[in-house]
């Protein structure tokens, strides 16, 4: 979200954003794009980093950040957990954690008028080499266009 200039949709959609320490470490390591490291150097008040008290079974997922994110979401009873990796999403859902992907967040933002051109933002994701399938992006865009059409139809009916 930072790399494509859309990080500010998060506080408009969610009261706060909490990430586990492991993800914070990933976002500040030297291999992370400079724009992300700069943002992490001065995060806004709606963003916080917290270590989970417990961790889900480490054999479930190889990636510590995903394990800790699922654990933290359970602990704080998060409304939604932002996860894109398919196996991690399946594991979170199996544990009763609601998930949303980056494409879903961007679609929700577009549905609420926070993003004027969802297709252009999808293009930014592609340019940033974000790992998301064309199928997911196309489905997200189709849902958004259907949402916009339904709103237009509703206004015409009124």
What are these regions (language model features)?
Residues 97, 101-147:
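Hydrophobic alpha-helical interaction segments
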Residues 1-80, 86, 90-98, 120, ...:
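Active-site-proximal, substrate-binding regions of enzyme catalytic domains
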């Amino acid at each position: 979200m930072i790399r494509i200039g859309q990080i500010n949709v998060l506080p408009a959609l969610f009261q706060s954003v909490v990430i586990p320490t492991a993800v914070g470490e990933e976002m500040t390591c030297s291999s992370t794009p400079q724009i992300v490291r700069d943002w992490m150097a001065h995060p806004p008040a709606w963003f916080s980093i917290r270590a989970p008290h417990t961790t889900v079974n480490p054999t479930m997922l190889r990636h510590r950040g995903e394990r800790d994110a699922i654990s933290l979401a359970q602990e704080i009873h998060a409304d939604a957990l932002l996860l894109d990796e398919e196996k991690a999403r399946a594991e979170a859902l199996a544990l009763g954690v609601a998930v949303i992907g980056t494409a879903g967040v961007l679609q929700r933002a577009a549905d609420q008028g926070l993003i004027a051109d969802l297709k252009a933002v999808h293009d930014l994701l592609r340019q940033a080499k974000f790992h998301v399938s064309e199928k997911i992006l196309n489905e997200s865009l189709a849902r958004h266009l259907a949402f916009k059409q339904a709103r237009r139809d509703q206004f015409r009916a009124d």
